[in-house]
């Protein structure tokens, strides 16, 4: 959703702020899951060389017809994200993952092996920004996602809304092989006007405490239990959407 003065109110606008904060000098970026195409266009406007990977051709069609997405100057690949990253090593300064299919991320795109493949795509000093969701009623599942990413990247920053009113809500992780500072996100909160949720989420940025996760097992391809861990959360998430007006388009 975009206001009349151009402020983006959903998770897309929040991810743009994270890009500005943690990858200001990126020259070549990869977007896995293009949704409405707003992130690839934003990166292109920043002067970057951009590749966008989307498995669903209907998403590309919808982005073009309804969200004014123009693929000119953007490398668009209709392909599975996982097969794409396997072929591109040391190629990108920034990788953005927004890999939702329906109301969840496919579980094979949440494993240690997948994040290792994403890590291999990065140039030295590169950053990954991961869009996901957290359920305040299911901290085991939340911690498992964080532990899985942390098993690959030595530095992980967690950004989740401190006041989600008990609802399943979007969250982001920033991951890198080089140190990250939550102070960068905190400073971004004071930079310009933004939705209240984004402000408080940036202010609550924290580095992942790996000691806290020492008893949480990362998920692998061979033992992928995310569909089980998130079953109750997905039901809660769907029930939230059932309360929306039927004519509202949710991206």
Regions found by a protein language model. Give the residues of each.
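S-adenosyl-L-methionine
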Residues: 60-89, 94-97, 103
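Glycine/threonine-rich flexible loop motifs
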Residues: 103-110
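Conserved Class I S-adenosyl-L-methionine
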Residues: 141-160
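Conserved beta-strand signature within the Rossmann-like core of class I S-adenosyl-L-methionine
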Residues: 125-132
């Amino acid at each position: 959703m975009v206001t009349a003065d151009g402020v983006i109110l959903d998770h897309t606008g929040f991810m743009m702020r994270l890009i500005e904060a943690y990858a200001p000098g990126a020259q070549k970026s990869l977007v896995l899951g293009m949704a409405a195409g707003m992130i690839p266009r934003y990166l292109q406007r920043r002067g970057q060389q951009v590749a966008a990977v989307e498995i669903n051709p209907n998403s590309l069609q919808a982005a073009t017809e309804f969200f004014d997405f123009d693929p000119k100057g953007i490398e668009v690949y209709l392909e599975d994200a996982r097969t794409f990253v396997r072929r591109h090593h040391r190629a990108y300064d920034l990788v953005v993952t927004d890999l939702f299919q329906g109301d969840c991320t496919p579980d094979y795109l949440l494993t240690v092996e997948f994040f290792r493949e994403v890590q291999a795509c990065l140039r030295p000093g590169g950053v990954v920004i991961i869009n996901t969701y957290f359920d305040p009623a299911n901290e085991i599942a939340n911690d498992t996602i964080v532990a899985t990413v942390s098993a690959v990247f030595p530095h992980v920053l967690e950004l989740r809304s401190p006041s989600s009113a008990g609802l399943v809500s979007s969250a982001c992780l920033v991951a890198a092989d080089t140190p990250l500072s939550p102070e960068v996100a905190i400073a971004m909160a004071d930079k310009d006007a933004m939705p209240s949720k984004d402000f408080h989420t940036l202010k609550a940025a924290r580095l992942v405490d790996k000691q806290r996760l020492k008893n949480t097992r990362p998920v692998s391809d061979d033992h992928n239990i995310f569909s089980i861990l998130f079953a109750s959360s997905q039901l809660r998430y769907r029930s939230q959407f059932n309360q929306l007006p039927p004519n509202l388009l949710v991206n």
